[in-house]
Amino acid sequence: WNVIALDLPGHGRSEGPALESIEAMASWTIEIIDTLGLNSIALIGHSMGSLITLETASRLSDRVTHAVLIGSISPMPVSEPILDATANKPGAAHSMLTSFGFSKQNLMGGNPNPGMWMVSDSMRRYEDEAQSALDSDMRACNAYQRGLEAASEIAAPTLMLHGDADRLTPLRATKPLLDALSNARMDIIPGSGHSLMVEDPNHVLDQLKIHLL
């Protein structure tokens, strides 16, 4: 596989203003895919990225060979306290999203990756992101209502990965999305919260290999 890890506009090393809707983010993603001339792709997205994956895969049809949705529910409502914090109190927003982004067990410490502290790494990543981009992202997730319709249009084999201790997108809320997908499999990671890729990276990698290879 050749891997392309995208930084959306206004994020990471990508310049420009942040896009304000999941639909716009999907359109931008498709522009990148078209520019690169890719006709056989697997799409993988976490949280907001999973909504972008849904919307993108529904539009690209049979160009998508596989899809992976990590920590995904649809709709994906964002609470008013978080929206208020991302707009007006960035420090509080970083703390809230970090606190709720991990299982209670993993917040206490420990890391399968030696030499790393999950909680501190999460805080640094939020602090490095522009406040306006984080606020725009949260509002885009909250506003996106086409997820189940998009899911029903996806024929590609789809893997849903979810932590059983996810407090941002609770496991109990995954059923509508799972039911809307015609060719889906759910894998539940014990003891993980919303930040699966750092809470249990080996499990996530193993499931990606099973699904994609």
Model-derived features with residue positions:
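Short alpha-helix in the alpha/beta-hydrolase fold that links the catalytic acid
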Residues: 156, 170-179
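Catalytic active-site module of serine/aspartate enzymes centered on a nucleophile-bearing elbow/loop
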Residues: 184-213
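Alpha/beta-hydrolase active-site loop signature
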Residues: 8-12, 74, 193-196
